Every structure is written in C-alpha cells, then in structure tokens.
Amino acid sequence: MFCEQCEQTASGNGCHQWGACGKSPEVNAVQDLLVYCLRGLASVVLKAKEAAISTREADIFTCESLFATMTNVNFDQRRFTDYIQRCLEIRENLKAQLGSLDWSALANYQPNFNESLVSQGQEVSLELIEKVQDLDIFSLKLTAIYGVKGLASYTFHAQELGQEDDSVYQVIQETLVAIDRSDLNLNDWVAICLKVGAANLRAMELLDQGHTETYGHPIPTNVPLNPRLGKAILVSGHDIKQLAALLAQTANTGITVYTHGELLPAHGYPKLKEKYPHLYGHYGTAWQNQTKEFAKFPGAIVLTTNCLMPPHENYESKLFTLGPVGYAHINRLETVDGAIDFSPVIAKAQSLLGFTEISEPRQVMVGFAHNTVLSVADTVVNALKQGKIRHFFLVGGCDGAKPDRNYYTEFVEQVPEDCIVLTLACGKFRFFDKQLGSIEGLPRLMDLGQCNDAYSAIKIALGLANAFNVSVNEIPLSLIISWYEQKAIAVLLTLLHLGMQNIRLGPTLPAFISPNVLKFLSDTYHLQPITTPAKDLADCLG
C-alpha cells in the first residue's frame, strides 16, 4: 500500500500497511487501479476533444470517480470495480468514434476481471513512479494528482448545479495524461500544478455561481445548535443540491432536517431557508467526531460527500450514502428518473424516536460570503484607515483528530480585539461558537462558508486590495490554513497561482512534499509551517 494524500498519514510519512482513514490495502489497490484506468481514458478523451467529438460524459464521469478516490469518501471495493468497468466502456466508445489510431499501452490497458483486481492495482501503484523518477518530480506529480482530485470534486458539484467550463475539464484530463510522461522537467511540473490551481479557481467560481443563482447570495443568519422535538434527519457532507432535494421530499412530513459538518453554511442561503422552514438547525461539529455524534442522533443520517469514517455498528443501520460516497454493507440511495430517492431515509426517520427533549438555546451565525462582506466594504475600509481594525486573519480549512490542531483554537483566542477573524470549512468547528464581539458593527468572527468558499475569501482579499490600490500581499491579511485532504491541496494551489504569500500551513506539512520542493515554496511564496499561536501572531502583526 502507498498513500500520502492526506494530512493524517501514518507517522507523517504515508500509509503503507493500512490507511489512517480506515481504508484497507485491498480497497486502496483497486482505487489505484481506477486512477490508472482514468489516466488511460484521459489520453483518449484529449484525442476526442481534438476531433470535436463530445466528451461530456467522460469528463463528468472522470470527476465523479476521482472524487470517489479522495480521503473519507468511498471504502467500497465493489463500487471501485464498477467505476473501472464503466471507465473502460466510455474509453472504448470514444475510441470507436475516433476510428483506427495508434493507441498507447495505457490507453489499451484491460484489467482481468476474472483475477484479483487487488494484485493488478498493486502493479500500477503510484509508488512505482517514484522508483523511476526524480524525487522532486515525483513530489510534484503527487501534488498535481492530489490537487486534481480536489479540483474534480468542486467541478462535480458545479456541474450538478448546471455550471460547467470545458477549460476546467481540459486541465483535469491533461494533468492525468501528464502523470505518465517522462519528458517533463521540474519547471514543467511547477507550471502544471499552478495550472491546476488556476482551474480550481474557475471551478470554485462556477460552484459559487451555481449556489448563488439557485439559492441566493448567503446572508447573515442565526442557526440554532439545539434540537427541537420530533422526528429528525441529519445531512452531512458538502452537497447543497442534494440537501435541497431531501428538503423537497420531506416537506409536510413533520420531519425536521439538521445539517452536520460542512453543510452548516447552507442555512445562509435565503431561498433555501424561505422555501423549506423544516431546515431548522445544525447538529454536531467536524467530521472526526461523527462516530460519537451519529450514535447519539435519534434519526436517520445521510452522507452526501466526504467526510465518511468507517461506521460503528450502533448507527450503521440508520446511515445512508449517495453519489460518490460508499461503504460496503451501508445503505446506498439510488437514483430514480435522474433524482435521488430519499424515501428509505424518510421511512427510517419516521421509525426512530427523534428528539424527545430540548436543551438550552444556543446559536451561531453564518452567511458572511463575499457578497455580504463586500457590501459593507466602505465600513471595512474606513475602519482600517481609522485604525479601528488592525488586521484580518483567515483561520480555516480542514479539521482533523490530531491534538496539535488545538493550535487553531488557541490562535483565535489570542487574536487581539482590534482584529477580525474570517473562517471557512470544517476547521471553524474548533472555535465557531466563540463570542468575539464586534468592531464598528462588524462581527469579529465571520463564517465565509464551506471549503469551496475559499473563493469568497479570495474575492474579499482582492476587493480590499482594489480599495486600497495595493497588491493582495500588501493588505493587512494573514492566512492561517489547516489542511487535511485533497480539496485543501487544490485550494492551496489556487492561492499559489494567485501569488499569495506568507501562508502558514499546518498542523503538519504534506508527506508528499519533498525537501527541495518545500524549499522552492518557501523561497518563492514564503510558505511556512505553523509554530506557536503567540509567535505566529507576533510575526503577522509585526
């Protein structure tokens, strides 16, 4: 087994015996085989694009199946086998349309489904590239492929909402093809990684456009953290479209719907809240706490995307997955006439007790996306000019189980009272319910949204830079980023593409980044690891 794609890799050096995420070596091998087949499909897709043959089916499939290979998404070996079979079907269909061409061995690769796909996957592990490549090029290849996985996930969600851009699909397919090239040097691979970052910026823009055109621009909204009496369904993940579909199917059933994890920002979308008043509150915190939180939740639970952990027996019967998410023997929701059928979830929720007690009211506020913040840009600019606001800190990203992630809580607690904290993604659950007060009517803690709402953070940063007529690196903003999985890698590549400097990254640096690549990032972008809250705060504030 070889996997270095997440922050919690074994001993910080990669998983080689069993995945820290809970993924077995067998599942990992079949997952690697899928990625290998996708690399072969990509070469055919690019030829088809040159010939003006439609590749939309292949592009969408590539995004979904890459999404499935991300950390904490799919643990089901059978599902990966299905993806491989479908990959080959799409590939051969495109080849038939292209006619007789001289295809590479990879484009003609055919696994033997009568023999172990595990052993065949082990034969095409990414680790084998390391044995024949320069370590630094291998490092950047891993950066590119892990970044493309994150890019594919955002592209998948944007496409669900009717937002697509062929140039994004092109970058995904070109990057997959590049993995098997041996003629590219270090500078070429730096350029490829930055191109992934540029495409990811476009994908996040498309997703933002899909969300806001469908559900309205987020507005500041108070979200209850205490449940109300009655039957309940909990929805976790990132997929707001599937949350909306569930809300439509649960209307007038008496069931209350709660968000979990990265779906907290859904409460800020006005059209969603106005149309579905039974979208009531938020339950729980970040993904790594789900085994305790799901066990206590007295209703049905739906996982729309990552992060799924290996489920415990005491709640697996009420857990449902959909889309790219999967786990062997766990209920899977099927698509009927192009839409997910949530009736099994509704039936399960109605069979369970639901909440029978209420607790003391608590709430948090969401909805501070770019439209909201930039609408008060004059207030922000004046407060900065008058010295009432000294500095902005973006403290956010992924959460995880490591104790050293307490750094982010302590950092926010130590931020001076004349500074504002922007946050996003599940890293916010370390401090999302803290009462930090306000400056000039502006909350000192603003939740920008999901991880893909890094787009909002970028829009806000560029807006402030424009207001002061300076570069984005000259505004009083520091990026204190926590990472865990491949979406965070894609976002980091986007920030580097934009030339953003002095990013502090933690809690540890990626295992796939070689010493020389790290030195390049440090020298070029001043990318640096977090140290202690006190030291980093002092350095940021000068």
Swiss-Prot record:
Modification Cysteine persulfide, positions: C398
Protein's GO biological process: response to hydrogen peroxide
Enzyme class label: oxidoreductase
Location in or out of the cell: Cytoplasm
Chain sites annotated for binding hybrid [4Fe-2O-2S] cluster: H238, E262, C307, C398, C426, C451, E485, K487
Keyword line: 4Fe-4S, Cytoplasm, Iron, Iron-sulfur, Metal-binding, Oxidoreductase
Domain of life: Bacteria
Gene3D superfamilies, A to Z: 1.20.1270.20, 3.40.50.2030
Reactions catalysed according to its record: A + NH4(+) + H2O = hydroxylamine + AH2 + H(+)
Family: Belongs to the HCP family.
Record's function text: Catalyzes the reduction of hydroxylamine to form NH(3) and H(2)O.
Protein name per Swiss-Prot or TrEMBL: Hydroxylamine reductase
Species of origin: Microcystis aeruginosa (strain NIES-843 / IAM M-2473)
Organism lineage string: Bacteria, Bacillati, Cyanobacteriota, Cyanophyceae, Oscillatoriophycideae
Gene behind this protein: hcp
